[in-house]
């Protein structure tokens, strides 16, 4: 996957709308909002947006999801997300960063109409964010998402996931980072179709870290990858 370089301060000049929703946003509402926003961005009637949310417990299926990878012992709702990837869990204590951007234009280190570079930029955004919180995270060839060494097990585990959809060169869906979710809820699926590795969270590294800490780090890390300054929507 192509690597993107960090931007210099002189290259950062544009702004991007940034919205954080309190509480738990029902997943179907998020799908509807993202689809409508992506359509409006394509039509030129809305600005690009990064939207930070949490969801009630839910399993979502990407376009490559297999029925055999869903166990769902708690009977959580399941939805077809229409994004790339396989099964993913979302729930309280996990931050979703939905990225709705016009990819026909260059965005910081990401060239126009380059999906591989866009994915690399999102992964870099997550690793840069986690570094600001004292967590060393990395990517692995052939494994989408962001990984780290779980401090409790000493083994590689996923701390951030990624799944996007692109409609008429406008992105929607995005990334997730585990802050303090109930990690046993991930047992209801084979996360992203990968059986060999577990999942972890920020609170396994530092129990004092909060969702607000992550949100601040996400905003601070964004310009270095995508060349725009977050502004409240």
Swiss-Prot record:
Catalytic activity, EC: 2.3.1.181
Binding site for substrate: 83-90, 161-163, 174-176
Key words, A-Z: Acyltransferase, Cytoplasm, Transferase
Site (Lowers pKa of active site Cys): 158
UniProt xrefs under InterPro entries: aa-tRNA-synth_II/BPL/LPL (IPR045864), BPL_LPL_catalytic (IPR004143), Octanoyltransferase (IPR000544), Octanoyltransferase_CS (IPR020605)
CDD domains assigned: LipB
GO cellular component terms listed in the entry, alphabetical order: cytoplasm
Catalysed reaction, written as an equation: octanoyl-[ACP] + L-lysyl-[protein] = N(6)-octanoyl-L-lysyl-[protein] + holo-[ACP] + H(+)
Gene3D superfamilies linked: Bira Bifunctional Protein, Domain 2
GO molecular function annotation: lipoyl(octanoyl) transferase activity
Top-level taxon in the UniProt lineage: Bacteria
GO terms for biological process, alphabetical: protein modification process
Active site (catalytic residues): 192 (acyl-thioester intermediate)
Residues covered by the BPL/LPL catalytic domain: 44-230
Subcellular compartments: Cytoplasm
UniProt keyword Acyltransferase present: yes
Major subcellular site: cytoplasm
UniProt pathway: Protein modification; protein lipoylation via endogenous pathway; protein N(6)-(lipoyl)lysine from octanoyl-[acyl-carrier-protein]: step 1/2
Function: Catalyzes the transfer of endogenously produced octanoic acid from octanoyl-acyl-carrier-protein onto the lipoyl domains of lipoate-dependent enzymes. Lipoyl-ACP can also act as a substrate although octanoyl-ACP is likely to be the physiological substrate.
NCBIfam families: lipB, PRK14341.1
Family: Belongs to the LipB family.
Further remark: In the reaction, the free carboxyl group of octanoic acid is attached via an amide linkage to the epsilon-amino group of a specific lysine residue of lipoyl domains of lipoate-dependent enzymes.
Protein name: Octanoyltransferase
Organism: Gluconobacter oxydans (strain 621H) (Gluconobacter suboxydans)
Lineage of the organism: Bacteria, Pseudomonadati, Pseudomonadota, Alphaproteobacteria, Acetobacterales
Gene name of the record: lipB
